Amino acid sequence: MIRPVTPSDYNALLKLNSDSIPHVNFINSSIFADLHRQSTLFVVYEHEEEVVAFLIVLDETASYDSLNFAYFQKKFSKFLYIDRIVVAERFRRKGIGQSLYHFLFTLDYGPRPITCEVNLDPPNPKSISFHEAQGFISIDEQLTGKGRKKVSLMMRVKEM
């Protein structure tokens, strides 16, 4: 079941997020709360009353200190930015990530590109393949994390 996040979910989200490092950046509960306040969409996926995945989406009006978000702010006047999609390891490849994205794609946010980034270094080939299967293409690459990471900046270009 997909539902809006609540502050009572933060501990589960922190665990899911920490378990997914280095494919996502570390964030603490105060950052989760800030993202929650600014998000256009922040939902969790529950399986048998356990939060097993989440999706955070911001729009161009967010105040977010991220090189990747800043890249899209410079490129587009309006856009949606997928800050992160995280699925618990034991629930991956079961359609949960696809369900979260389908939920996002069916909402009407007007004619805005949907954007995200995926790590190239450290490599995350499963996420690249997943995003390509959801209609995303790489439009650029950039170094982040003081040059320790390289990301593919992606945009969704087709309806699935």
Model-identified regions with their sequence ranges:
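A short, internal acetyl-CoA/4′-phosphopantetheine-binding micro-motif in the GNAT/acyltransferase core
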Residues: D83-R92, N119-D121
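Conserved active-site alpha-helix within GNAT-family acetyltransferase domains
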Residues: D121-D140
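A short beta-loop-alpha structural element at the N-terminal edge
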Residues: M1-L13
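Conserved GNAT acetyl-CoA-binding A-motif
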Residues: D108-L120
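Conserved acyl-donor/pantetheine-binding loop and adjacent beta-alpha core of acyl/acetyltransferases
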Residues: I56-R84
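C-terminal "cap" of GNAT-fold acetyltransferases
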Residues: L143-M160
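Conserved beta-hairpin
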Residues: T40-D59
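Conserved acetyl-CoA-binding loop-helix of GNAT-fold acetyltransferases
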Residues: V87, R93-T106, A133
